[in-house]
Amino acid sequence: MKLCGVRSSGVSLTRSSDFPRFRAAHHGGAHTATRHQSLCGRRLDSYMGAGKRWCFRPLLAEPRRYSNASSAFTTDGATAPAHGEGLYVSHYAMPEDARRLVGTPQLLPRNPAEEVAFKKNLIRSFPQACIRNVSVVAHVDHGKTTLSDAMLRFSNLLPADGATGTFTDRLKVEKERGITIKAQTCSVLLTLRETGTQYLVNLIDTPGHVDFQYEVSRSLCASEGAALLVDVRQGVEAQTMAQFYAALEQNLTILPVLTKMDSVMSDAEVEKTLLQLEDSTGLLSREVILTSAKSKRGIEQLFQHIIDKVPPPCGREGFSDMKQLPAMHPGSADRKKVEKELVPLRALLFDCWTSESSGMADGAASAPVSTASSVSSGTAPASGGQSVAKDGIYGLIRVMDGTVTPGTTVTFFHSGKKHEVREVGIIHPTLHPTAALTAGMVGFVFFPGLLKKDVFIGDTLCTLPTRKHTMRVVATGSPATASRTKPATAAETASSDDASGSGSSSVVEPIPGFKTVQPVVFAGFYPDEGVYITQLREAVDLLCVNDPSVTVEQLQCPALGPGLQLGFLGFLHMQVFKERLLMEFGQAVLVTPPQVQYMYVEQHGDPDDPAQRKPVSVSNWRWPHEGVGAYLEPFVTATVLTPSEYLNEINSAALSAFRGEMQEMRVIDGARTLVRYRMPLADLARGFFSTVKSSSHGYATLEYDDLTYMTADLVKMDIVINKAHISALSTICLRHEANTHARRIIGSLKEKLLRSSVDLPLQALVGSKIIARETVKAYRKDVTAKIHAGDISRKQKKWNDQKKGKERMARRSVGTVTLDQSVLAAALGATTAR
């Protein structure tokens, strides 16, 4: 039996109150431990039905001891390993690999004549019973990338002495920051030595930061299992629980894994983490797998648990298009028989990328390189020998039912448009074309000429093999609006497909999409000097193919011109997106604070009628009050789910700093509380999400919905420089916030404006009232530098002449102030990406 990753011949099953006595017995020596082990083995059956509370503890393989360089000891004839001075020998020892599994990488053959045979044999050897789809999830810096690389090296896909992150961290920004941003998939081929059975394990390495939770949710939709990693030194943290609940909602098999076992300095650390994991998740300690990617221990045991415990896919197998079969005479008996056995293709599209935004071309340079004989026209060879087309979109799919092959024409449920698949394959760890992707497999498909507007992450790709097959009509909108319950629901179409032989039409159902996420951080992106808005929009659109969680809206700023307002899942998400624009597309942008759209209704108008609302503009001729009945501000309902101990701090900030109004407070369980606030969208966008995360140390979650408009007291604030109105800096704000905004803008202008030969007065006005004022002092020439003696009146005469000259210059230079883009951006609170 394996307990906590330790092989032992029995189980130590004791009461919680008897645990100190149990520990003392084990410290007594090997004889005592053996006697206690045999005793527990005889009483195991009687204890299981006693109905009492028991604690499972792994048996000691040997008594725990301290060793140093000057003392050597032996236990049961075995010499303890020398770990150096003062190091601790833990009894939570990871077992040696049983060498039952061996990695068998299938690379493209060097002989072009063998390529067709290779593709066919690769697919035929993997029925659904031999496929496992697993996502690797964990908190930030808990060892996901290192463990994923160790698993690939165990499978002989990466060199044993390669650097960490050679596969998972493909993007340049990932390598510079040292974090995982995009979920990466790799198909691993393993052979069981005893039976020769070959397994296809699809590993998905996911990010750990809360800003990239959308990547995790999409990956879980394509999996039947999740490996939940926990750092043995750090224990259970915020994202550990978030990933656990996300996997639980998808009804996935969860494999608990302790990482970084090579860093353990005391068994108390392991026991504390095991107890914490069991108390917070309910996962039994005896099911935890102990691993160390650095020492390459526990990797085979983790693979063995994936094969043994993660259920295989359960889709419907079969061909999905007559083009996938040899030509048959229309109306022949063979063709009719084959048509009855056709299975409509149903595949979930859970990621997309282009050749410019994937990082695939340089992500696995250490992989074995084959010849580029398979590169066709219109494609360019990339590392690993794969063919990467230049024009088009790659889609990462999980095939639920049927088969997709090159040349298959698939239909997108959302748009109803049809597109032909040019190439299919697996990521191993680079793009390797195959003959087909069958039910249960995870792989890529390439669509030449596919546009971004036709791609929706979470959409269902399908085929209609015969005229009897029809698609269920879906409502217009994003296909990912419905919450997914489980990865595969093949039973939805089983009954209708079985009726196809009786003359009734078979309805192909869409796969339930995963829940979309809402942006919580907004920012305006404007092209830097020398960059056109069309170039920026094209780069953003291409990057949004690879990052669908970003929302895009058009903006028009009088100061900076046309721009884009983007919505992100956090500040780190925004910074990474800005860096990717610069690194991958060369687009330097100005990032400004978020803006919200205020509305107004005319006199005698109804504020509750959306048709009567009109957007407020600083150039509106009706401003400030001519013919206006009321000004409106957008409000949302923010829902916060937080551990109860952090509720007071979050509630205080929401009510005092973010103009929130509590609508509901409900205790979910003994540890969590749900609170709903009504607050302005502007306050939520300017930092409420960050406050919630920092106050709860990352454990709380925030969602918002129900956008409505409520009356507000708005004013127009004008900026005057040297008696000239600067229309580009005119803004609309709430009356009680006007003074704060005015001081910030005037202070920024004072710092950024260059001094001239005359004083520049800076003023902020609401109507005709000055609410803030500063002065940029003029340069003064030292006109008395050559006067070294004499009466003081000589210097005063020079100073008076200089003063009169300054006054004449000021009268001639009224209103002649030129502001460049950097000054305007600084006044609006912008930052430049360089």
Curated annotation (Swiss-Prot):
Region (Disordered): 363-385, 476-507
Pfam families: EFG_C, GTP_EFTU, LepA_C
GO molecular function: GTP binding; GTPase activity; mitochondrial ribosome binding
Top EC group: hydrolase
GO biological process: positive regulation of translation; translation
Binding, GTP: 138-145, 205-209, 259-262
Compartments it resides in: Mitochondrion inner membrane
Residue span, tr-type G domain: 129-314
Biased composition regions of type Low complexity, renumbered to the chain: 488-507
Span of the transit peptide along the chain: 1-66
Topology of this chain in the membrane: Peripheral membrane protein
GO cellular-component term (any): mitochondrial matrix
Catalytic activity: GTP + H2O = GDP + phosphate + H(+)
Alphabetized InterPro entries for the sequence: EF-4 (IPR006297), EFG_III/V (IPR035647), EFG_V-like (IPR000640), LepA_C_sf (IPR038363), LepA_CTD (IPR013842), LepA_IV (IPR035654), P-loop_NTPase (IPR027417), Small_GTP-bd (IPR005225)
EC number per UniProt: 3.6.5.-
Keywords: GTP-binding, Hydrolase, Membrane, Mitochondrion, Mitochondrion inner membrane, Nucleotide-binding, Protein biosynthesis, Transit peptide
Role of this protein: Promotes mitochondrial protein synthesis. May act as a fidelity factor of the translation reaction, by catalyzing a one-codon backward translocation of tRNAs on improperly translocated ribosomes. Binds to mitochondrial ribosomes in a GTP-dependent manner.
Family statement: Belongs to the TRAFAC class translation factor GTPase superfamily. Classic translation factor GTPase family. LepA subfamily.
NCBIfam families with a match to the protein in the record: small_GTP (TIGR00231)
Matches recorded under HAMAP family: LepA
Annotated PANTHER family: TRANSLATION FACTOR GUF1, MITOCHONDRIAL (PTHR43512:SF7), TRANSLATION FACTOR GUF1-RELATED (PTHR43512)
Record-given protein name: Translation factor GUF1 homolog, mitochondrial
Species in which this protein is naturally found: Leishmania infantum
Phylogenetic lineage: Eukaryota, Discoba, Euglenozoa, Kinetoplastea, Metakinetoplastina
